[in-house]
């Protein structure tokens, strides 16, 4: 009976451990990069990035520009994402700052990578582990949840 109970406990631990693998998870990172306040949320499964949403806030004074110059700057980004199915891109222009919203949760990653000029090995998916290293290298810190406060 003791052996049976031990076996059941071990089996339950294995089931719980295995069910945690392969589960979708989301992590959020925040920090300042090149004059932008970046807030990004990444959903991944195992090492595959499934979706990413980013909010970039740029204060005009920090970049030495006014609202009109910021519109020209963002027009370049907008042209990259324009007409790319599955990408939501918009910029809210406020009096002293611009807030850029980028959400490519439903995009075909191969098409996005091609549009951005990014080549992934054999057109494979984006590695969460590599992306996380890049974000941390750029000074972003993990955050509990995504809000633009």
Model-assigned labels for residue ranges:
Residues 23-149:
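Subset-of-secretome marker
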């Amino acid at each position: 009976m003791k052996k049976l109970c031990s076996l059941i406990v071990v089996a339950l631990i294995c089931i719980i451990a295995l069910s945690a693998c392969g589960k979708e998870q989301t992590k959020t990172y925040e920090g300042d990069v090149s004059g932008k306040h970046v807030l990004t949320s990444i959903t991944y499964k195992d090492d595959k990035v499934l979706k990413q949403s980013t909010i970039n806030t740029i204060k005009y004074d920090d970049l030495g520009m006014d609202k009109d110059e910021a519109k020209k700057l963002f027009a370049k980004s907008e042209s990259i994402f324009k007409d790319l199915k599955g990408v939501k891109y918009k910029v809210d222009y406020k009096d002293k700052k611009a807030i850029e919203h980028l959400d490519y949760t439903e995009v075909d990653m191969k098409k996005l990578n091609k549009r951005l000029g990014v080549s992934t090995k054999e057109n494979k998916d984006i590695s969460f582990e590599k992306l996380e290293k890049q974000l941390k290298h750029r000074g972003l810190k993990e955050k509990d949840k995504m809000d633009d406060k």
